[in-house]
């Protein structure tokens, strides 16, 4: 038996001249791993468009969707839920596990706890974010809190899915990078403050909860370089488009088709 899906993320639609996904689909369903745009109306329009291109679109938000709402992330999430539930063929993965043909799709943003590299002081990274990204102390506190709750949600959900006999495999979806080792090769990031806002190291605790070895693939975004690695039998893969006119961006961009055989 097999299950196939297209993976896309970090479209940053507002930085490109246009986004037209007609005739681009290579699978019946699509996973979008966050950072569609900062403008909520663009996010909504893009998801509507993708919903016309696929039988189903499974979406998780990125940090960019909350760019103007970091002071009140609770309200920000409520607004996303309200908008997305009206869109045909689009499913918001936050707090919503989807099971398709024996495959569970489990997703959350993930955020970052400012401690991705334990050798870099998290409090200094927190302050650096406030100064460089013009975040308030309230915003960074909210982000750090959600990084913990998102990790707990994924760990607890993986544990529960071990007992579901109808779930053969699990696809994990986070916007941020789940393991520092996946991007440790990047000399532009290594040892930098920015490295510590790339991912959530707590996510790897979900591996210990996977006692039946159901986790098959872990999809993520946020890091605009290319990653496709297998670690401990699990495929870690991203497919980010990136912002136009930046070092890591793709003018020619296609979905990454992923097939799970079991």
Question: Which residues are covered by each model-predicted region?
Answer:
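Binuclear metal-dependent phosphoesterase catalytic core
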Residues: 2, 99, 190, 195-215, ...
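Active-site-proximal loop/helix segment associated with metal-binding centers of metalloenzymes
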Residues: 106-171, 176-194
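Active-site neighborhood of phospho(di)ester-bond hydrolases with catalytic His/Asp-centered motifs
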Residues: 7-9, 30-35, 58-63, 91-95, ...
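Active-site environment of divalent metal-dependent phosphoester hydrolases
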Residues: 12-17, 37-42, 64-71, 97-99, ...
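N-terminal active-site segment of His-dependent metallophosphoesterases
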Residues: 1-60, 64-76
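A basic- and aromatic-enriched beta-loop-alpha substructure that forms the phosphate/nucleotide-
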Residues: 56-129
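Short, conserved loop/helix-junction motifs that constitute active-site signature segments
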Residues: 23-26, 49-54, 164, 207-213, ...
């Amino acid at each position: 038996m097999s299950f196939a899906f297209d993976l896309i993320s970090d479209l940053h639609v507002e930085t490109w001249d246009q986004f037209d996904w007609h005739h681009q689909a290579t699978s019946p369903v699509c996973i979008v791993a966050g950072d569609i745009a900062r403008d909520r109306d663009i996010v909504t329009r893009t998801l509507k468009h993708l919903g016309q291109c696929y039988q189903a679109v499974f979406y998780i938000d990125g940090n960019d969707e909350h760019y103007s709402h970091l002071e009140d992330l609770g309200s920000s999430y409520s607004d996303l839920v309200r908008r997305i539930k009206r869109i045909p063929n689009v499913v918001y993965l936050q707090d919503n596990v989807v099971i398709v043909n024996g495959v569970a799709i489990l997703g959350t943003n993930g955020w970052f706890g400012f401690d991705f590299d334990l050798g870099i002081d998290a409090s200094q990274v927190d302050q650096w974010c406030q100064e460089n990204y013009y975040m308030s102390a309230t915003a960074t506190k909210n982000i750090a809190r959600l990084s913990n709750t998102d990790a707990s949600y994924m760990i607890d959900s993986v544990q529960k899915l071990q007992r579901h006999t109808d779930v053969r495999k699990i696809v994990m979806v986070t916007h941020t990078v789940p393991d520092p080792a996946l991007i440790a090769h990047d000399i532009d990031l290594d040892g930098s403050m920015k490295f510590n806002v790339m991912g959530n190291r707590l996510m790897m605790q979900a591996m210990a909860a996977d006692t039946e070895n159901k986790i098959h693939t872990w999809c993520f975004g946020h890091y605009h370089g290319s990653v496709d690695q297998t670690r401990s039998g699990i495929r870690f893969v991203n497919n980010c488009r990136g912002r136009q006119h930046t070092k890591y961006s793709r003018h020619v961009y296609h979905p990454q088709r992923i097939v799970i055989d079991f």
